[in-house]
């Protein structure tokens, strides 16, 4: 049984856009042969499904704002990148953000109700659907934010840090996408799910269960580090972890929030040729 390395899984993910679990499973079934894994995934429809899931409504804006020890992050969606850059749409998103900060509103339904009339008027003017999708907030001793264009926004709350450090941490979160602050914060459900996957891979390599379990223990430590902020290599100095960086500054991150436009939304794509053909039949 060939060893299923992290680099092999990464390459398959990059080539197919499929999820990590799906790629691991395909590589195990193909005995580590990446070309065979791709062929099998094409036959099973896994690649097609992954591409469909990746067709998110990736249009709109992420907005962030800090007011003293309180910060808000907001996502407002539209249907095209053209409208996302429209002045009227941008002004609407800014107005919603200001209201969320001023009123400390974290319930998106409250924001939707407050701005429904303006939203409807803007939809009529622009000709695209507009949605106030989500809003969240952080409070903390020191707050930092970072925006990668209008598509990615991050808030970070920390203790004992200066503004520059928190800004750099926010940039790291934008780039590295941690899911938790510290390895010990990784939920038992996530750990157990990954453990079972790794154990199955180790067992299928022909190792005795006792040896396989020891192998998996080491892999799990690596896994919890990879998905947590403090366990990741710092993007501006990969020789040290974010945890080491914080220790050097006698600082601590209490929480962070990362929003990316359209994540989790499936975008409906129009087949232009099919649409024209359908219209010609009707005429």
From Swiss-Prot:
<comment type="function">
    <text>Associates with the EF-Tu.GDP complex and induces the exchange of GDP to GTP. It remains bound to the aminoacyl-tRNA.EF-Tu.GTP complex up to the GTP hydrolysis stage on the ribosome.</text>
</comment>
<keyword id="KW-0648">Protein biosynthesis</keyword>
<dbReference type="InterPro" id="IPR018101">
    <property type="entry name" value="Transl_elong_Ts_CS"/>
</dbReference>
<keyword id="KW-0963">Cytoplasm</keyword>
<dbReference type="InterPro" id="IPR001816">
    <property type="entry name" value="Transl_elong_EFTs/EF1B"/>
</dbReference>
<feature type="region of interest" description="Involved in Mg(2+) ion dislocation from EF-Tu">
    <location>
        <begin position="80"/>
        <end position="83"/>
    </location>
</feature>
<dbReference type="Pfam" id="PF00889">
    <property type="entry name" value="EF_TS"/>
</dbReference>
<dbReference type="InterPro" id="IPR009060">
    <property type="entry name" value="UBA-like_sf"/>
</dbReference>
<dbReference type="GO" id="GO:0005737">
    <property type="term" value="C:cytoplasm"/>
</dbReference>
<dbReference type="GO" id="GO:0003746">
    <property type="term" value="F:translation elongation factor activity"/>
</dbReference>
<dbReference type="InterPro" id="IPR014039">
    <property type="entry name" value="Transl_elong_EFTs/EF1B_dimer"/>
</dbReference>
<keyword id="KW-0251">Elongation factor</keyword>
<dbReference type="InterPro" id="IPR036402">
    <property type="entry name" value="EF-Ts_dimer_sf"/>
</dbReference>
<protein>
    <recommendedName>
        <fullName>Elongation factor Ts</fullName>
    </recommendedName>
</protein>
<comment type="similarity">
    <text>Belongs to the EF-Ts family.</text>
</comment>
């Amino acid at each position: 049984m060939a060893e299923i390395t992290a680099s092999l899984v990464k390459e398959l993910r990059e080539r197919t856009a499929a999820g990590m679990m799906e790629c691991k499973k395909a590589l195990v079934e193909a005995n580590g042969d990446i070309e065979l894994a791709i062929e099998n995934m094409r036959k099973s429809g896994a690649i097609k499904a992954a591409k469909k899931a990746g067709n998110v409504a990736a249009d709109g804006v992420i907005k962030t704002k800090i007011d003293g020890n309180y910060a808000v992050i907001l996502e407002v969606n539209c249907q095209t990148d053209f409208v996302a850059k429209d002045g009227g749409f941008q002004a609407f998103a800014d107005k919603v953000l200001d209201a969320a900060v001023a009123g400390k509103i974290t319930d998106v339904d409250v924001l939707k109700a407050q701005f429904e009339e303006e939203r409807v008027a803007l939809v009529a003017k622009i000709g695209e659907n507009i949605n106030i999708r989500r809003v969240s907030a952080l409070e903390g001793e020191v707050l930092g934010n970072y925006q990668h264009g209008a598509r990615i926004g991050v808030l970070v709350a920390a203790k004992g840090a200066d503004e520059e450090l928190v800004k750099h941490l926010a940039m790291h979160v934008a780039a590295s996408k941690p899911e938790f602050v510290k390895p010990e914060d990784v939920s038992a459900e996530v750990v157990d799910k990954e453990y079972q996957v790794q154990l199955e891979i180790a067992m299928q390599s022909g190792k005795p269960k006792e040896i396989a379990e020891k192998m998996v223990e080491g892999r799990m430590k690596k896994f919890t580090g990879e998905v947590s902020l403090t366990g990741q290599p710092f993007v501006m100095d990969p020789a040290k972890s974010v945890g080491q960086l914080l220790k050097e500054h006698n600082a601590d991150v209490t929480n962070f929030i990362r929003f990316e436009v359209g994540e989790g939304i499936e975008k409906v794509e129009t087949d232009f040729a099919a649409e024209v053909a359908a219209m010609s039949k009707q005429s």
